[in-house]
Amino acid sequence: MSTSIELFPRPLQDEVVDYSSESTVGVEAGRTEQSWNEDFAREQIHNLVRQLFLPGWPKPLRQVVFSPVDSGTDVLSICIRVGDALAEQAAGSCCVAETCPVQQEQILAEGCSAHSIQKQFGTLRDSAEQLSSNLWFMSGEVFQQGHHGPMSALWLRARLAELRLEFDYTVFQGPVVSGDTAAAMLGGLCDGLVLVLAANSTRRLAAQKAKETLSCANSRLLGVVLSERTFPIPASIYQRL
């Protein structure tokens, strides 16, 4: 089985968002399935970055939110991979930022050190964890540094302005859209929001409600990312390996 991440800038049409039966892929001779999967996933991420950040017209996107429709959907790993690809392709500083704290174990699993979740003082960039020459990871604790309670539009607007001064691009791991208004508010204050759907579990009704929530908040929906998508490689291909 293989997993892909794709951007669909169009309305969803299926009761269950599952494109697994629509795609088949081949494996080049002499390559393992794991090697092909890794290259394919990397290509998907790079295409996603080019669609969102690099066209530069009518104006370049600098702050983009990735928010799930359902709780439990893995968004952090997508954001980190998008940030890594963006740092490779873009000429500027990039940051992957959580908007709310998560468990330390989850951060460490994505390749960030414990140093990044310790509260520090100074500029936001100084408090973030530098992952490469132009890529930083900002934990939820650092993002909300000096703030307590629910995010207000006034505080959030000021924090986003700080980030624009310190980073050329910021990829946000946003809250669940169906949870409250925080995701829609964040998307409205940023350049837009990408909905993250789990291919085999997100239902059409939940996705439609999420889109309505964003529309009511005047939050720009940039597209839909389909994650956790699996599809079979034909048996005839396996027989040639």
Segments from the language model and where they lie:
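Conserved catalytic-core segment of NTP-binding enzymes
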Residues: G149-L241
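P-loop/Walker-type NTP enzyme "switch/lid" segment
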Residues: S21-H46, R50, W57-R62, S67-T73, ...
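A conserved segment at the C-terminal end of the G1
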Residues: L76-A97
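Short, aromatic/basic amphipathic alpha-helical patches
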Residues: C79, I107-S116, K209-E212, S236-L241
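Short, well-ordered coil/turn elements that cap or connect secondary structure elements
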Residues: Q89, S132, C216-S219
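C-terminal lobe/tail of nucleotide-utilizing enzymes
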Residues: M1-F53, Q208-L241
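A generic secondary-structure signal
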Residues: Q51-P55, D84-A85, E162, T213
